[in-house]
């Protein structure tokens, strides 16, 4: 019973770490999606602030507002129009959000199982103490 409780605690910890990574990724994707949403108003020659991660922005001059470079997976980037990039990022963000929900559900399930198992262990201990006639806590 104790080994199973330890396993649940370990799994909860792993899921919590995974949730942190997914939440960070979702935030990055949301920021990129928001940026691309406002990019349609930009004209050639405009100075803009470009988010580069970690809360850092750099100043840049737009040379072609019809093209952006976006990740298409596996560390490969491709040139595309801002709308297509926003759509890809939105789809990735939605998949990450689904994964976040699944991980949260996994955490909740393990926490519920852990709580139930802990209550069973406490009840068994109390029953054992009562059978021995020892004082209970």
Identify what each model region corresponds to.
Residues 1-72, 76-137:
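Intrinsically disordered, low-complexity regulatory regions in eukaryotic proteins
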């Amino acid at each position: 019973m104790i080994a199973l409780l330890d396993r649940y605690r370990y799994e909860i910890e792993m899921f919590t770490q995974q949730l942190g990574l997914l939440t960070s990724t979702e935030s990055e994707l949301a920021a990129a999606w928001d940026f691309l949403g406002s990019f349609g108003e930009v004209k050639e020659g405009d100075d803009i602030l470009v988010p580069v991660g970690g809360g850092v922005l750099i100043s840049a001059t737009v040379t072609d507002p019809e093209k952006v470079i976006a990740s298409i997976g596996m560390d490969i980037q491709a040139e595309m129009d801002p709308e297509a990039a926003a759509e890809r990022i939105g789809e990735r963000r939605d998949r990450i959000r689904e994964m976040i929900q699944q991980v949260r559900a996994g955490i909740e399930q393990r926490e519920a199982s852990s709580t139930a198992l802990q209550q069973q262990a406490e009840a068994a201990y109390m029953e054992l103490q009562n059978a021995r006639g020892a004082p209970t806590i």
